[in-house]
Amino acid sequence: MLARRQHDLTVCMEQVHKPHNVSAVIRTADAVGIHHVHAVWPGDRMRTMVSSSAGSNSWVKVITHRTIGDAVSTVKAQGMQVLATNLSDNAIDFREIDYTLPTCILMGQEKTGITREALALADQDIIIPMLGMVQSLNVSVASALILYEAQRQRQIAGMYQ
């Protein structure tokens, strides 16, 4: 089981503040074999809430950062591409990304999404195509869709052996 962990695939939550969303992202990360996620919280309050609310914390380490700049520089130092979930003219369908490369998926805050600073630091904007009237999914649902596409590609490539 531990040999199947994906050390070069992670999620970074930028000020995702609802404990049930944080917990769901962490549980999904564990389900696809991610052993650590990153979270940006400027204050100490959310760190306490997430540590008490996320049951998967015993399997998935949450690495906290005070700024998005710190978080992105940490994952880029590990050679990861940083993908921002953001509806923009430059965004591409999340299924067109090569997730067999070292990857960090940046998920924004529930209400306002990803900050301008984070978007400037990201390598690529990605979108989940929406055919209905709504323009976004819940952060935990969106992260699950993207992570399972990453898992699918990595399984085909034999990265879970």
Question: What does each of the following model-derived ranges do?
Answer:
Residues 1-161:
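Post-transcriptional modification and biogenesis factors for structured RNAs
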